[in-house]
Amino acid sequence: DYVANYVKANLPQYAALPVLSVSAPFKSGFGGGTDYTDVAQGNVAINNAADLYLYPNTVYAVKVSGADIKNWLETAAKRFNQINPALTTPQNLISSFPGYNFDMFTSKDISYEIDVTQPDISKGGSRIKNLNYKGTAISPTQEFIIATNNYRASGGGSFPGIDGSKTI
């Protein structure tokens, strides 16, 4: 709501655009089996909250197209290895791609599927299927405002099209 309210109050030229948010887990097992945040039952302490968000990032907003969102998600989907459904032996689903680059759009207004049977974007594949906003397919030219952090907005993680030039 912070970014949506800021846009409405300070950037009226973008007020009609949908505002979505994206985030990534910082501790998601990338560093091994202990690379998770364990919050014990009961009161949450300051160190629990600090353990969830490790970096001094700030909130930024970027104006992107539907094509940018798809490429953003395709890059995040590199978190998963390609799975061969014909194999009956176990296959590792999680790749060595850092969890802090596994950006997820979590708004109820956006939905998508990640097809891990397809190669990832770095191999010319397309894993993101059924990318919708409010139940309707997102057009490559449709515009959105995305709340993210300054690291990602400035090009951190090498996400296609997110290079600092789209910050509003």
Residue locations for each model-derived region?
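Feature captures C-terminal
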Residues: 2-168
